[in-house]
Swiss-Prot record:
<feature type="topological domain" description="Extracellular">
    <location>
        <begin position="1"/>
        <end position="22"/>
    </location>
</feature>
<keyword id="KW-0472">Membrane</keyword>
<keyword id="KW-1003">Cell membrane</keyword>
<feature type="topological domain" description="Cytoplasmic">
    <location>
        <begin position="122"/>
        <end position="142"/>
    </location>
</feature>
<feature type="compositionally biased region" description="Basic residues">
    <location>
        <begin position="328"/>
        <end position="343"/>
    </location>
</feature>
<keyword id="KW-0807">Transducer</keyword>
<feature type="modified residue" description="Phosphoserine">
    <location>
        <position position="457"/>
    </location>
</feature>
<dbReference type="GO" id="GO:0045202">
    <property type="term" value="C:synapse"/>
</dbReference>
<dbReference type="GO" id="GO:0007274">
    <property type="term" value="P:neuromuscular synaptic transmission"/>
</dbReference>
<dbReference type="GO" id="GO:0098839">
    <property type="term" value="C:postsynaptic density membrane"/>
</dbReference>
<keyword id="KW-0325">Glycoprotein</keyword>
<dbReference type="GO" id="GO:0007213">
    <property type="term" value="P:G protein-coupled acetylcholine receptor signaling pathway"/>
</dbReference>
<feature type="site" description="Subtype-specific residue that binds to snake venom muscarinic toxin 7">
    <location>
        <position position="397"/>
    </location>
</feature>
<feature type="region of interest" description="Disordered">
    <location>
        <begin position="225"/>
        <end position="256"/>
    </location>
</feature>
<dbReference type="GO" id="GO:0007186">
    <property type="term" value="P:G protein-coupled receptor signaling pathway"/>
</dbReference>
<dbReference type="GO" id="GO:0043270">
    <property type="term" value="P:positive regulation of monoatomic ion transport"/>
</dbReference>
<comment type="similarity">
    <text>Belongs to the G-protein coupled receptor 1 family. Muscarinic acetylcholine receptor subfamily. CHRM1 sub-subfamily.</text>
</comment>
Length: 460
C-alpha cells in the first residue's frame, strides 16, 4: 500500500474502463483474493507465534509485531475494498465509507513506514552503542515508541482525509470515485511522495549502510583478536568434565554415602556456553553483554552442598565441595585459577565477540530483507507519481492499478521475510500450520547461551 496518492491516482483518468471480459474479472478477483488470504494468514501467524512462543518476545520483535498489525489491517480491509473498486469500475459504497477506507488505509501504510524506521534506528543504535542503548532498550520503551508511531500516522492522515471537505467548504471528489481530495493536485501528490516514501527510504538506506560498515569493522577486529591468540602449554580452558573429576585439585572426593540435596530441583541453570546456536533470536537481549564489566577468563566455583543421610544432627561446619560444581564468570577468580588458566581471557573474549557478531548479522539480515521488499514493492508506484507530476497522461491506467496493488503485496511478503531470516519464526510457523504446537510445549526447547531456562516438563 502507499501513502502518497489516491487509488488509481489522479482524477484525470478513469478508475477502470468498463467492459472488461468475465475472464479478466475472474482472474483479477481470484488473484487478489488469494493475495488477501495469504496476507491475512501470514500476519496472523506472526501474531499467534508472538503469543505462544516466549522466545519471540524480544524488544526487536515488538517492532515486527507492530508491522504485522499494520499489514493485517491492509490485508483485511484495504486489499478487498480496492479489489471491489477495481472490479465494479466505480465506488458504490458511499462517501463516508470511501473516506473511512482511505483513512484506515493511509494510517496503516504510514504506520508501516514508521515501524520500518523504528526497526532501522533500533538496529543502528544496538550496533553502534551496544552498552548505553541496550540498557535503555526495554519492552516498555519499545511499546511507547510504537504507540507514538501509530499516533503520528493517525494525526497526519485521518483528520485531513475525513474533514478536508469541511475545511474548504465543499467536496470536490468526482461522483463514483474514491480518492483523497487534497491530493487531487499533482504537485501536492509529489510533495507527499517525497515526505512519505523517498525521505524515509533515504534514511533507512543510510542507516543500513552504517550498520553494515560497523558490522564489517567488528568482524575485522574479531579476526585480529582470534589471530593474536597463542595458547600455551596446557593452557586454554579445560573442559567442564575435566574440572569436575573427583580427586582433581580443588575438588576433593566426595565421601561415600553422601548424596546431593538438590537432585530433584528444577533445571533452572544452564552452564555458560559460548557456542553459537541457530535458535538464537536476532533481537534478543539475553546475551552475554551482562558480564561486560567482568574480567574475562575469571571464574568462581559455586559449591553445591552434599548431605549425609546418616547424619543425626546438622553441623556448623561448612559443607565440603563436591564434583557437582558450577562455574561462572566473576571478577576475582582469575588470580585463583592458576597459571594454566591465563590464556582463557582472550579466548572467552573472542567467543563473546563472535556470539555478539552473529546476533548482529542475523538482525541485519532480517532488516535487509524487509527493507529490500519495501523498496521493490513501493518504488514503481512512487516513480509513477513523480512522472505524473510533469506529464499527466504519460502513465497508462493499467500501470497505476498494478503499481498500487504492488504496494499492497509488500504486506504479503513481510511475514515471509521473518520466516526466511529467523529460525524461531520459521519453526513456530511450521508447528502452528501442522497443529503440533501442543506437543512442542512439553519437550525441551533449545535456548540461547547463558540464559536462565526452566525446561518444560510435567515433572520436577
Amino acid at each position: 500500500m502507499n501513502t502518497s496518492a489516491p487509488p488509481a491516482v489522479s482524477p484525470n483518468i478513469t478508475v477502470l474502463a468498463p467492459g472488461k471480459g468475465p475472464w479478466q474479472v475472474a482472474f483479477i478477483g481470484i488473484t487478489t483474493g488469494l493475495l488477501s488470504l495469504a496476507t491475512v494468514t501470514g500476519n496472523l501467524l506472526v501474531l499467534i507465534s508472538f503469543k505462544v512462543n516466549t522466545e519471540l518476545k524480544t524488544v526487536n520483535n515488538y517492532f515486527l509485531l507492530s508491522l504485522a498489525c499494520a499489514d493485517l489491517i491492509i490485508g483485511t480491509f484495504s486489499m478487498n475494498l480496492y479489489t471491489t473498486y477495481l472490479l465494479m469500475g466505480h465506488w458504490a459504497l458511499g462517501t463516508l465509507a470511501c473516506d473511512l477506507w482511505l483513512a484506515l488505509d493511509y494510517v496503516a501504510s504510514n504506520a508501516s513506514v514508521m515501524n520500518l524506521l523504528l526497526i532501522s534506528f533500533d538496529r543502528y543504535f544496538s550496533v553502534t552503542r551496544p552498552l548505553s542503548y541496550r540498557a535503555k532498550r526495554t519492552p516498555r520503551r519499545a511499546a511507547l515508541m510504537i504507540g507514538l508511531a501509530w499516533l503520528v500516522s493517525f494525526v497526519l492522515w485521518a483528520p485531513a482525509i475525513l474533514f478536508w471537505q469541511y475545511l474548504v467548504g465543499e467536496r470536490t471528489v468526482l461522483a463514483g470515485q474514491c480518492y483523497i481530495q487534497f491530493l487531487s493536485q499533482p504537485i501536492i501528490t509529489f510533495g507527499t511522495a517525497m515526505a512519505a516514501f523517498y525521505l524515509p527510504v533515504t534514511v533507512m538506506c543510510t542507516l543500513y549502510w552504517r550498520i553494515y560498515r560497523e558490522t564489517e569493522n567488528r568482524a575485522r577486529e574479531l579476526a585480529a583478536l582470534q589471530g593474536s591468540e597463542t595458547p600455551g602449554k596446557g593452557g586454554g580452558s579445560s573442559s567442564s568434565s575435566e574440572r569436575s573429576q573427583p580427586g582433581a585439585e580443588g575438588s576433593p572426593e566426595t565421601p561415600p554415602g553422601r548424596c546431593c540435596r538438590c537432585c530433584r530441583a528444577p533445571r533452572l541453570l544452564q552452564a555458560y556456553s559460548w557456542k553459537e546456536e541457530e535458535e538464537e533470536d536476532e533481537g534478543s537481549m539475553e546475551s552475554l553483554t551482562s558480564s561486560e564489566g567482568e574480567e574475562p577468563g575469571s571464574e568462581v566455583v559455586i559449591k553445591m552442598p552434599m548431605v549425609d543421610p546418616e547424619a543425626q544432627a546438622p553441623t556448623k561446619q561448612p559443607p565440603r565441595s563436591s564434583p557437582n560444581t558450577v562455574k561462572r564468570p566473576t571478577k576475582k577468580g582469575r588470580d585463583r585459577a592458576g597459571k594454566g588458566q591465563k590464556p582463557r581471557g582472550k579466548e572467552q573474549l573472542a567467543k563473546r565477540k563472535t556470539f555478539s557478531l552473529v546476533k548482529e548479522k542475523k538482525a541485519a539480515r532480517t532488516l535487509s530483507a524487509i527493507l529490500l521488499a519495501f523498496i521493490l514493492t513501493w518504488t514503481p508506484y512512487n516513480i509513477m507519481v513523480l512522472v505524473s507530476t510533469f506529464c499527466k497522461d504519460c502513465v497508462p491506467e493499467t500501470l497505476w492499478e498494478l503499481g498500487y496493488w504492488l504496494c499492497y503485496v509488500n504486506s504479503t511478503i513481510n511475514p515471509m521475510c521473518y520466516a526466511l531470516c529467523n529460525k524461531a519464526f520459521r519453526d513456530t510457523f511450521r508447528l502452528l500450520l501442522l497443529c503440533r504446537w501442543d506437543k512442542r510445549r512439553w519437550r525441551k526447547i533449545p535456548k540461547r547461551p547463558g540464559s536462565v531456562h526452566r525446561t518444560p516438563s510435567r515433572q520436577c
